[in-house]
């Protein structure tokens, strides 16, 4: 670990269209090979499509989707006396947001729609309605933590 301590968190700039730091994080998560304008086009297109389909505020739909995808518990491997236990731990807020965005974008890429814009739009709408693969991933994570509750005393 560095002697100076952990590096300070850099402030997140809100995106110019919606003024939301969450949209900026989503753009950065969609980003591939440094092509920021392409990532922005995909995210803004998905949010506009979500506005057209749901008829509401797309940022509100994104926030609702994030709330439905954010995990509150996860399991971490802990080695004790030659055995490896899956120990349930609470997820810090920053990590839960990062995981939720990673899952949303990852499962968007795995969908069957033609363009990434459509895939992301539909995954956001599904997640805001409590459906979709990203929400299922959160439920699986919570189920795993619940089934390993017996090892919670190994927490660190």
Curated annotation (Swiss-Prot):
Alphabetized UniProt keyword annotations: Ribonucleoprotein, Ribosomal protein, RNA-binding, rRNA-binding, tRNA-binding
GO cellular component terms, semicolon-separated: small ribosomal subunit
GO molecular function: rRNA binding; structural constituent of ribosome; tRNA binding
Transmembrane segments: none
GO BP term, example: translation
Pfam families: Ribosomal_S7 (PF00177)
InterPro entries: Ribosomal_uS7, Ribosomal_uS7_bac/org-type, Ribosomal_uS7_CS, Ribosomal_uS7_dom, Ribosomal_uS7_dom_sf
Record-linked HAMAP family: Ribosomal_uS7_B
Family: Belongs to the universal ribosomal protein uS7 family.
SUBUNIT field: Part of the 30S ribosomal subunit. Contacts proteins S9 and S11.
Function: One of the primary rRNA binding proteins, it binds directly to 16S rRNA where it nucleates assembly of the head domain of the 30S subunit. Is located at the subunit interface close to the decoding center, probably blocks exit of the E-site tRNA.
Name of this protein: Small ribosomal subunit protein uS7
Organism from which the protein derives: Paenarthrobacter aurescens (strain TC1)
Organism phylogeny: Bacteria, Bacillati, Actinomycetota, Actinomycetes, Micrococcales
Name of the gene encoding the protein in the UniProt record: rpsG
């Amino acid at each position: 670990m560095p002697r100076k301590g952990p590096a300070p968190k850099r402030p997140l700039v809100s995106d110019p269209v919606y003024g939301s730091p969450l949209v900026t994080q989503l753009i950065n998560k969609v980003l591939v090979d440094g092509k920021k304008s392409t990532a922005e086009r995909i995210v803004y297109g998905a949010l506009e499509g979500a506005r057209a389909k749901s008829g509401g505020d797309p940022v509100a739909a994104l926030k609702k989707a994030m709330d439905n995808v954010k995990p509150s518990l996860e399991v971490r491997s802990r080695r004790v006396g030659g055995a490896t236990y899956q120990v349930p731990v609470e997820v810090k807020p920053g990590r839960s947001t990062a995981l939720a965005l990673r899952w949303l974008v990852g499962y968007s890429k795995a969908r069957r729609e033609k363009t990434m814009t459509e895939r992301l739009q539909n995954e956001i709408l599904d997640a805001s309605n409590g459906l979709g693969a990203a929400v299922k991933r959160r439920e699986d994570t919570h189920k795993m933590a619940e089934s390993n509750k017996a090892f919670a005393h190994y927490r660190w």
